[in-house]
Structure formats: C-alpha cells, structure tokens
C-alpha cells in the first residue's frame, strides 16, 4: 500500500459518495484519491453518518480523511480555496 497512514490525516478529492444500507444501518461509501498520490489511486471506505463532517459532500470536493490504525474514521469537507 503506497503512503499508508496508521494514524493521522491526508487531504483528498472526493470522487464518489453513495448511501448504502448494511443490515438496515445507514452508511456512506466514499471513493477518493489522495492529493499527494501522483498515480491518483482510487481508495474506498465505508463510514457511518457520524463520521462525515460537513453539510453535503459532492464529487470533486476537497476532503480531509482521518485514519486510525489504517482505517478511515472521519471525513471532513474542506473549505473551497
């Protein structure tokens, strides 16, 4: 895994977000690319609604992805420049 993060944050661009239901529990599947990845490898994570900070996320948004033990635990929409 290139640029794996055990604990910390990385900036990324949101490529896709879609709601999913896992055993009746609402979650989000997010697909993103890290800004510092020259190959723009797609990354995916499934997170609960409590892990998404920001009113509405849309493809193309800049986001901050927080990791703990290599797992996405928080996604925050960054202000536009």
Question: Where are the predicted features?
Answer:
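Short boundary/loop segments of OB/S1/cold-shock single-stranded nucleic-acid-binding domains
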Residues: 1-18, 80-81
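A generic structural micro-feature
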Residues: 6-8, 24-26, 57
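Short aromatic-glycine-enriched beta-strand elements
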Residues: 21-33
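Short, flexible N-terminal segments of the mature chain
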Residues: 32-40
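Beta-strand/loop nucleic-acid-binding surfaces
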Residues: 39-56
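Loop/turn positions that initiate beta-strands
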Residues: 59-62
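Short, Lys/Arg- and Gly-enriched loop/turn segments at beta-strand edges
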Residues: 68-79
């Amino acid at each position: 895994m290139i640029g794996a993060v055990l604990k910390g944050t990385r900036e990324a661009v949101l490529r896709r977000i879609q709601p999913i239901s896992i055993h009746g529990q609402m979650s989000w599947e997010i697909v993103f690319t890290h800004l510092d990845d020259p190959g723009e490898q797609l990354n995916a994570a499934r997170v609960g609604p409590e892990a998404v900070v920001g009113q509405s996320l849309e493809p193309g948004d800049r986001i901050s992805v927080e990791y703990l033990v290599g797992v996405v635990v928080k996604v925050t929409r960054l202000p536009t420049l």
